């Protein structure tokens, strides 16, 4: 990069992109005392929700709880701007319970802008970054081997302004060379109504970072005044008292609204089949992979041809807008056919379309080029977070933004990065998946991706991560005190339930036996009572067997801990056993191609990813248990050879001293 202009300003950290990843990253670095600038193409669309105006859902809600437990923002804003909340999977076990909030998208963005503007050490800049400035230094290592180290120095905007930075975090979302498609028509855009980011992809290639192409999409928005709601099933808000945030000061003053449900019809399906050739994917205009778990309506009709109907949700985008988001109905069909399709749905026969659905393809950075800290392997102090890493969803983006922000500051402070493991969090599961697997489609977090989902619940995210958030410096003293008080009450209640015993001769015992149909033999502790499948903490309250008026989160935590005690102990033992084996480090200089006892696929994948330890190596596709055993043996032989060489050298040196 030629420096045609002098430095405008200098910052410790520059964040490129003002989406959910960028906001979390910028707030994190600024809160930790580092001068930060957040650059975005449009300051009026900060933390925008260009697709679904919702936060949470299966596994995603666990991510939001975790980000909040660490001191992040997304959970608080989702709580404060929620206009509907529901618990998903409530009839199943606690491992998969999920809070989902419909949010007011304009209110969400407005509140995020207010937070950014009032965060110390943080500057907001409207500009398009097109170049990264890299410094190169040559180092001489072992055996006089020369290596070139690259480090980020600063950034340049489209119009030539230069800003120096000690660290840079790229959170460009879908904007890198973004192109939106409606039918066979396309235009350059990061999302509808906003220009794409030009130039940065080419610059990334020049500095040694590869990019590939992905696709996503968003459905049409319709005018709620044109919908016949009497023809639809209603879906009311049923969990307004549930929160993503563990901060007791967070409140919601938004009015609660209902969503509605309609379904596709045979007419819908036939119209799609007749026009498949006009879509960007089936028409062959683009070949980028779309998200498996959020397919277009044409994908659903093709892949589930035997299904007669698909559920479609109508979700308000806010309190003061007539726009309704047609969830489950994203498409790349031409605009006129989209309206025809919408009018085949019950309740939408006379609807007015305010915004058409569109597909968007964009460049992303395959995350196998990143370290676990989200720093790029190629360039020091350059981090990448969010949808640019191949993920889909605000929640995944926010979590990565916080991790990148924390680790950028730790790198600048010469501290070791914070590494989130699969055993500790969904954040760790997601990052491990991203950096060890070649993505062929946008990645979304799922409960099925975690081997430890009973341990990694949403309700206990604070117990798992708040202490870490406090140690990092993102949890303030007030929040820390509230957390400690909660832990104290939770442990005291579990102790009380274990010690308090009911005799079967007591009147309350007879009442419980009569109403539950389960006998009490001799006597029983309240803990043993709570272990029964059909007995809940609410029953303890009902039978006046409580002492303190504990909050619902403590009641829930106590019940889960007791009911699932055996399972949780087994999972804890498994985690400890895995940790003992997986923490064994793997030297980064190993050339796996030369280890002939490894399978060819294992050699290729290990060399490409360069795992830091056996735990990471075990999660790489194509690396079998046999490969891990062979690698362990190879390392042991290597260590023995090194020890023998050291003994030989010591003897040589010793004999030389004696001869002198």
From Swiss-Prot:
Q: Which SMART domains match?
A: GIDA_assoc_3
Which parts of the chain are coiled coil?
none
Where it sits in the cell: the answer is: Cytoplasm
What cofactor is needed? Answer: FAD
* Residues annotated to bind NAD(+): 290-304
For this record, the Gene Ontology CC terms, alphabetical, are: cytoplasm
Keyword entries, A-Z: Cytoplasm, FAD, Flavoprotein, NAD, tRNA processing
Which Pfam family is an annotated match for this chain, by its short name? GIDA
* InterPro entries hit by this protein: FAD/NAD-bd_sf, GIDA_C_N, MnmG, MnmG-rel, MnmG-rel_CS, MnmG_C, MnmG_C_subdom, MnmG_C_subdom_sf
Q: GO:BP terms for this protein?
A: tRNA methylation; tRNA wobble uridine modification
Q: How does it assemble?
A: Homodimer. Heterotetramer of two MnmE and two MnmG subunits.
Q: What does this protein do?
A: NAD-binding protein involved in the addition of a carboxymethylaminomethyl (cmnm) group at the wobble position (U34) of certain tRNAs, forming tRNA-cmnm(5)s(2)U34.
Q: Which family does it belong to?
A: Belongs to the MnmG family.
Q: What is this protein called?
A: tRNA uridine 5-carboxymethylaminomethyl modification enzyme MnmG
